[in-house]
């Protein structure tokens, strides 16, 4: 494989301080083989995954150093004017202008935007670009997104123009073909790896046994249905709790807990590190994923890495990613067998639990960032004809 220069842009790293999209791009960037000379077109960001790149400064530094000792009405507007006068644009444009500068310079063979803005199109000068599509959630659930959402509008525009499209699962690839009409041979499936540690340096002390729910709880995540269907199991096991990460519970969720007499049974835990996450997974009775749709489902791999039994809605990409190393239930607005499957896991003998965990480790071996980065490098070379 010949050496190739690849330019990534700033988008995911200014959208998120942490999150799946920016973390995935950073893991790929870090694990690319030596034959790929990669650069990220970004000057400042508060994203936690990019902080080790010395040339990238914290975004808040420039903002805070300007009349930092004084607070007064209108200071925010003054900052906007300061940015325009001194940096050629407010913070998002600061990175965008730098990306355009590098695009114009042309020291790359392949461009890989990290989200769906089309700002780069006039500056490619015939060079190919790769587009990663993590999921088709906005297209499949339009009721939860605005009609002019950038993902919907720009995905539709950019996908036909890309030299190659990366899908993170075969299920996502099928959705891209069906919804966007992209030819099969243009879409390459590259699975994610898992960034979790193998052990935890910090053991969280939790007195009650618990089920673990990770991440967002909105809409297609099926959290409300999960609360409804898990109620009989919780009421028959007084010691059991449901530990939830992500944002704090809102009023609607608290009302839902009260309705089912579960006010003390759902507990929110704010996670501040991978070590804490690992410990939460490792101590749980099981990790439960009731979501109706995901592009990949990285928490499945995290649970596998932490030797935590996994209970999945039999939907979307879950069977593809988890294989036979998870337990599956069905869930819809009418019915669910989740209680039956929870009771099964609850009553596992040590031998049965260990057998499931052994399958998880076998399955986990299929996913690594090194393998993903090598596959990506081959695609870069193929489309650049090097």
Question: Which residue ranges define each predicted feature?
Answer:
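Carbohydrate transferase catalytic cores enriched for Leloir-type hexosyltransferases
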Residues: 1-386
């Amino acid at each position: 494989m010949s050496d190739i220069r690849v330019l990534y842009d700033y988008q995911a790293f200014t959208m998120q301080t942490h999150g799946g999209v920016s973390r995935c791009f950073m893991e790929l960037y870090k694990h690319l083989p030596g034959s790929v000379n990669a650069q990220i077109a970004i000057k400042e960001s508060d994203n936690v995954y990019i902080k080790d790149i010395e040339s990238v400064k914290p975004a808040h530094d420039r903002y805070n150093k300007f009349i930092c000792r004084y607070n007064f009405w209108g200071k925010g507007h003054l900052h906007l004017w300061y940015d325009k006068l001194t940096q050629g644009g407010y913070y998002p444009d600061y990175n965008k202008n730098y990306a355009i500068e590098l695009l114009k310079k042309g020291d790359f063979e392949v461009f890989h935007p990290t989200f769906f803005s089309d700002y780069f199109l006039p500056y490619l000068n015939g060079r190919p670009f790769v587009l990663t599509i993590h999921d088709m959630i906005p297209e499949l659930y339009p009721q939860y997104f605005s009609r002019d959402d950038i993902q919907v509008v720009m995905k539709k525009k950019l996908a036909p123009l890309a030299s190659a499209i990366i899908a993170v699962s075969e299920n996502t690839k099928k959705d891209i073909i069906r919804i966007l009409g992209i030819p099969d041979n243009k879409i390459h499936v590259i699975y994610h790896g898992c960034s979790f540690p193998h052990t935890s340096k910090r053991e969280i002390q939790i007195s009650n046994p618990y089920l673990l729910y990770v991440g967002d709880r909105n809409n297609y995540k099926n959290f409300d249905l999960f609360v409804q269907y898990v109620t009989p199991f919780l009421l028959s096991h007084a010691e059991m709790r449901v530990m939830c990460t992500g944002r704090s519970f809102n009023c609607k969720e608290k009302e839902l807990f009260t309705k089912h007499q579960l006010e003390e049974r759902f507990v929110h835990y704010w996670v501040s590190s991978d070590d804490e996450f690992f410990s939460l997974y490792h101590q749980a009775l099981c990790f439960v994923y009731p979501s109706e749709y995901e592009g990949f489902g990285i928490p499945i791999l995290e649970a596998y890495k932490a030797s935590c039994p996994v209970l999945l809605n039999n939907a979307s990409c879950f069977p593809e990613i988890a294989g036979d190393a998870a337990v599956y239930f069905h869930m819809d607005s009418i019915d669910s067998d989740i209680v039956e499957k929870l009771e099964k896991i609850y009553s596992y003998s040590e031998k049965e639990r260990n057998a499931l965990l052994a399958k998880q480790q076998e399955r986990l071996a299929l996913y690594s960032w090194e393998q993903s980065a090598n596959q990506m490098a081959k695609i870069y070379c193929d489309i650049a004809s090097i």
